Amino acid sequence: FLAGDAAHIMPPTGAKGLNLAFSDVHYLSNALIKFYKNNNADDLKLYSEKALSRVFQTVRFSQWMTNLLHTPSKENYLERDLQLNELKELSTSHSGQKVLAENYVGLPY
């Protein structure tokens, strides 16, 4: 079984690698304990599926944040205007701010 950066390398722009590593260790350690205490491998069999689900959610969020916060080329007016519109919407939408905050601090396990 792989965990942390050995399982998934995150770009530093998202600053999410440590969150994912803790999540991996949480799920893997619980699965190993269950296996060795109760001879039950169910959670071990699901570990990769659980981990990958969180990885893809986190990569999607990191990509979204990178696109939101990095300035597009000056010639690309459409991208710039879309980015500004999204930033404006985030500044006024409580539900958007909640989603941003939940993903920024890390998904619950």
Task: Give the residues covered by each predicted segment.
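Short FAD-binding loop at a beta-strand-to-alpha-helix junction that anchors the flavin cofactor
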Residues: 1-12
